[in-house]
């Protein structure tokens, strides 16, 4: 497959409500759609998930799109791609920049699935017709507001809830939710807000029957997480410091965690994600699909991944209306008894809603890729 053209669509969707974590707050989803067009006129779509600020990882939206334009697309223009797995190797000499790589690589996967006239889910070996999903709730001002939100999402059908926590917004909030919802599948996500000095507080969370505590310590740390996991009965889950299967191997070798939050964007795309999922299954590590407030294209890629058999725990994927009044794809993803349907149409299985996308588009740039074919 040769790619003739790339289209970079910069859009920004307002969130229904601000989403707050221990490191910052988002009021909108600022992103790019990466559209690749091959010699047969097939369109593949990826979504660039890097945030505006370098507070989740080092990448930002502006740095990632620069890497895509100046480094990744020129590489794509220089060769025939025979299978989507080649993209990971093609980009491998470029250090880091996983989210930039993922946005382009996922567009290639979509294009190949469409060329083969099958869904992306089927192409990567997924078998589920629908997937269980959970919901992630950002930091709230008070316990009362949090309880109202949890009740709202439980009423909508979500069976697993993740609470963002931070110093002074942890034990009291978790305890209140657990008392009000004693049978709810519940977990806490710290986004690296704690350190070893907070051990007694983290140990106190053991009593609330949590599914896991996600990323309590630093984004580069494996050793302190291993120290903590040995002293907690609750699973530790790693997120930010997992960028490749090598990171999972390191975490497993020293006992840093018993669960992995797998995000396509954070690990560089589908090829890397599949390796991680397979490793986790072989080594009895719970793996589940995380989210980054994706719009419809990114959500579709996530659902395809989560439809594989390695994923038994509900992910942070959620329905389209969890974050947005309207999404950029049709059909939108709707919750049905705590589940989302896995698209069966070709590729990612949804199409761009051009009317909605145009409404929220900030700019569009086209780049020709057919000058350097070899």
From Swiss-Prot:
Does Magnesium count among this protein's keywords?
A: yes
Pfam families with a match to the protein in the record: MR_MLE_C (PF13378), MR_MLE_N (PF02746)
* Cofactor(s) recorded in Swiss-Prot or TrEMBL: a divalent metal cation
- Which positions are annotated as binding Mg(2+)? 189, 214, 239
Provide the active-site residues from the annotation.
164, 263
The record's section on Gene3D superfamilies has:
Enolase-like C-terminal domain, Enolase-like, N-terminal domain
Tree of life domain: Bacteria
One biological-process term from Gene Ontology? Answer: menaquinone biosynthetic process
Per UniProt, the keywords (alphabetical) are: Isomerase, Lyase, Magnesium, Menaquinone biosynthesis, Metal-binding
- Read off the SUPFAM superfamilies from this record: Enolase C-terminal domain-like, Enolase N-terminal domain-like
Query: Which EC number(s) are documented for this chain?
Result: 4.2.1.113, 5.1.1.-
- The answer on whether this UniProt entry bears the keyword Transcription reads no
InterPro entries noted in UniProt = Enolase-like_C_sf (IPR036849), Enolase-like_N (IPR029017), Enolase_C-like (IPR029065), Mandelate_racemase_C (IPR013342), Mandelate_racemase_N_dom (IPR013341), MenC (IPR047585), OSBS/NAAAR (IPR010197)
| One MF annotation (Gene Ontology) recorded for this entry | isomerase activity
Q: Which reaction does it catalyse?
A: (1R,6R)-6-hydroxy-2-succinyl-cyclohexa-2,4-diene-1-carboxylate = 2-succinylbenzoate + H2O
Q: What does the UniProt function comment say about this protein?
A: Converts 2-succinyl-6-hydroxy-2,4-cyclohexadiene-1-carboxylate (SHCHC) to 2-succinylbenzoate (OSB). Also acts as a N-succinylamino acid racemase (NSAR) that catalyzes the racemization of N-succinyl-L-phenylglycine. L.innocua has the menaquinone synthesis pathway, indicating that the species requires OSBS activity. However, the NSAR/OSBS is not encoded in the menaquinone operon, raising the possibility that both NSAR and OSBS are biological functions.
Listed HAMAP family: MenC_2
Record family assignment: Belongs to the mandelate racemase/muconate lactonizing enzyme family. MenC type 2 subfamily.
- What's the protein name? o-succinylbenzoate synthase
Task: Give the originating organism.
Answer: Listeria innocua serovar 6a (strain ATCC BAA-680 / CLIP 11262)
Q: Which gene encodes it?
A: menC
